[in-house]
Curated annotation (Swiss-Prot):
Function: DNA-dependent RNA polymerase catalyzes the transcription of DNA into RNA using the four ribonucleoside triphosphates as substrates. Specific core component of RNA polymerase III which synthesizes small RNAs, such as 5S rRNA and tRNAs.
GO function terms (MF aspect): single-stranded DNA binding
Transmembrane helix listed as a keyword: no
UniProt keyword annotations, A-Z: DNA-directed RNA polymerase, Nucleus, Transcription, Zinc
GO-annotated biological processes: DNA-templated transcription
Region called Disordered, residue ranges: 133-163, 264-283, 288-313, 400-440
Protein name: DNA-directed RNA polymerase III subunit rpc3
Subunit relationships: Component of the RNA polymerase III (Pol III) complex consisting of 17 subunits.
Region (Leucine-zipper) location: 577-598
Residue spans of biased composition, Acidic residues class: 149-158, 288-307
Gene Ontology CC annotations of this record: RNA polymerase III complex
Length: 650
């Protein structure tokens, strides 16, 4: 455990949950694995306060606990990964709101705040209840409640319910009670179908190492395993341990909620310019919509939408946020940003449809908890997606043929290399209604866009043939490695210039080189090359290896080889990133404490939202400066978190 990640996680826990949580977490980080008496001794906290704090931290998944079978003693240790995800909460909620709507983001925020929660408890929370509609002049018109992005409409709610007096109030209360399950449960099922929440298992409260040791102990106690010896025993135990570990950690809730590889109710992704064609956003709206908008929206749902499924989720299920699945979704968003550098909007839309299909079938970014060393990581292909399935998800209004590039009519040839016949009317070809091409041509155009994405330098896609059908997939590990290299190269170029970037690329491609050979390949003067190498060596990006020619080890008889180790550089950059994030949070805390009294005044209920009325000109200027400074520091932390995700999580 490094110093700076421990410092960063302690700051995050203390800022989000208070000093008690921060003190317990810091004690566990300092002494690592402790029993309750030892933790009480080192933390110097009262027993009752410590027990309540530990119980709440276990609820938030900030602390692992494991009870030894031999001793019967419970050990506690910090969960750094869960503590770090506190910094990514805003990004996750923004993604959920964009994907599934505002109400889904509210539900996810509530689950994230509670750590984990039963469905029956979520039903009782007032913030998850639908807001009561307003009545005008005694007449009440019940607005239609709809979860855009999930195809869930408030069935059982009268569209036009005009009520008056006491009977009207009772009817309104009954309608609200009926609306609740049609709003919360479909949203939970939508989150579960996408994999963003999963069932809490007992193994989730134990560390990965404890789960592995427990599985190995259980397997080795079996009678058939005791009869094995040697290499066969090791291989069998390793295989069965991995299988048992997957079963214990599996909290998948997608069973019965996925149809043909797509979550039920998933909405077709709009193509470029789709937002301008529709005034409705992917969020929960509590306003009435006219019939034209309703018909337009209904045409965009998949055929197997969840709107007809009124079965609520089981009340006894305990759910939590599935951060591994969310990492997959955020990684796909980074791949889209990488593709946007060289591709058109239509190609990006096709690539997004492919990644969306792959996301539904991918549970985590990688199988191993740590990223293997450079060159030791094998290829890992995603589940292949058929070309026809991708074409079904593409927005029909997207011009696929024209976005690749028009051909000269005199030089136009078809797929067989022959000139097409002029079968149009007056020289004009009519593809279909609204200018749309036929299904066969559209599938071919989608394949052309995917083939364009498979070209160097990034090779974002790869074609496969499954059951004699063309399919496309993504090689995630090589793309994740490419993202890491691009991030390192961007940093090297920003610090040392393009000459240093050229030297690093040569060393990465050729391996260890002496100064003379490096100068010949990079075509740089010796003076410039030595200055760049010295500055990068001081920064830890390149290093020098001495290879003596004889046992005397004389400098004149020694070969000096320069090399670039991306793994060591990545680890060093990761530590520097943790340190920078920690310093940003410390600076933010210092600035907040310095303006504590003023900020308490601005956060009062009567002042908040009415700053111009209650604050002076000097105070308004100070508030504006504070908000700008806070946005700057938090924005820097979010940018650094993107770097951590690329270097560590993807």
């Amino acid at each position: 455990m490094s110093q700076y990640i421990a410092e960063l996680c302690t700051l995050l826990v203390e800022d989000n949950f208070g000093e008690l949580f921060g003190h317990i977490f810091a004690t566990l980080i300092r002494y690592d694995r402790l029993t309750l008496p030892r933790l009480r001794l080192y933390s110097k906290l009262p027993d009752a306060q410590l027990r309540r704090g530990l119980a709440a931290m276990v609820q938030q998944h900030l602390v692992y606990h494991y009870t030894s079978y031999e001793e019967g003693v419970t050990y506690y240790e910090p969960n750094l990964q869960s503590a770090y995800y506190l910094i990514r909460a805003g990004k996750i909620l923004e993604f959920i709101e964009e994907r599934l709507g505002k109400y889904a983001a509210t539900v996810m925020s509530t689950i994230m705040f509670l750590g984990h929660a039963q469905v029956s408890y979520l039903e009782t929370l007032p913030e998850l209840q639908p807001q009561a509609p307003t009545a005008v002049n005694g007449n009440h018109e019940q607005p239609e409640k709809e979860i855009e992005g999930e195809g869930v409409e408030g069935e059982g709610i009268e569209e036009e319910g005009h009520t008056n007096g006491v009977n009207g109030e009772e009817a309104l209360e009954e309608q609200e009670e009926q609306a609740q399950p049609f709003l919360l449960h479909p949203t939970l099922k939508a989150l579960a179908a996408h994999g963003y929440i999963h069932r809490v298992r007992e193994a989730h409260f134990q560390s990965y190492a404890d789960n592995v040791l427990d599985c190995e102990r259980t397997i080795k106690a079996r009678a058939d395993i005791k009869q094995m010896k040697g290499k066969k025993l090791e291989e069998t135990v390793l295989e069965l341990t991995a299988e048992m570990l997957r079963e214990r950690l599996d909290g998948d809730l997608t069973h019965g909620l996925v149809f043909n590889g797509v979550p039920r109710g998933a909405k077709r992704r709009r193509g470029p310019g789709g937002a301008e064609r529709s005034n409705k956003k992917a969020r929960v709206d509590y306003v009435a919509v006219d019939e034209d908008e309703e018909e337009e929206e209904e045409n965009e749902w998949s055929e197997d939408e969840m709107g007809g499924d009124n079965i609520p989720m089981e009340s006894g299920i305990t759910v939590r946020v599935n951060y591994e699945k969310l990492d997959v979704a955020l990684r796909n968003r980074r791949f889209l940003e990488l593709a946007e550098q060289d591709c058109s909007a239509a190609t990006i839309h096709v690539y997004e449809c492919l990644l969306r299909r792959i996301e539904y079938k991918t549970k985590q970014c990688r199988d191993t908890p740590e990223i293997p060393r450079e060159g030791e990581e094998g290829k890992q292909f995603a589940a292949p997606i058929s070309l026809a399935a991708i074409a079904e998800d593409v927005d029909p209004s997207v011009d696929l043929a024209g976005s690749i590039g028009p051909m000269d009519p005199s030089q136009a040839v078809n797929r067989r290399g022959k000139r097409p016949l002029d079968d149009g009317v007056n020289g004009t070809h009519h593809d279909g209604p609204n200018g749309a091409s036929s299904d066969g041509n559209r599938i071919y155009d989608v394949g052309q866009h995917l083939a364009l994405l498979s070209e160097p330098p990034h090779n974002l896609t790869e074609k496969k043939v499954v059951a004699n059908l063309p399919s496309w997939t993504v090689e995630f590990r090589s793309l994740a490695c490419k993202l890491r290299h691009l991030e390192l190269e961007r940093m090297i170029e920003a610090r040392y210039g393009d000459v240093a970037l050229r030297v690093v690329r040569v060393l990465h491609a050729k391996g260890k080189l002496d100064e003379k050979r490096l100068q010949e390949i990079s075509l740089l003067p010796f003076r410039v090359l030595r200055q760049v190498l010295a500055s990068m060596q001081a920064g830890g990006f390149v290093d020098l290896q001495e290879v003596p020619r004889d046992a005397q080890r004389q400098p004149s008889r020694t070969i000096y080889l320069w090399f670039y180790d991306p793994d060591r550089t990545r680890a060093s950059i990761l530590e520097d990133t943790y340190k920078s994030m920690s310093r940003c949070l410390q600076r933010l805390r210092f600035e907040r404490n310095r303006l504590k009294e003023f900020l308490e005044k601005t956060e009062r209920s009567d002042v908040k939202g009415n700053e111009e009325r209650y604050l002076s000109e000097a105070e308004l200027t100070l508030l504006e400066q504070w908000r700008a400074k806070e946005a700057l520091l938090l924005g820097e932390v979010a940018r650094l978190d993107e770097m951590v995700a690329v270097m560590r999580d993807y």
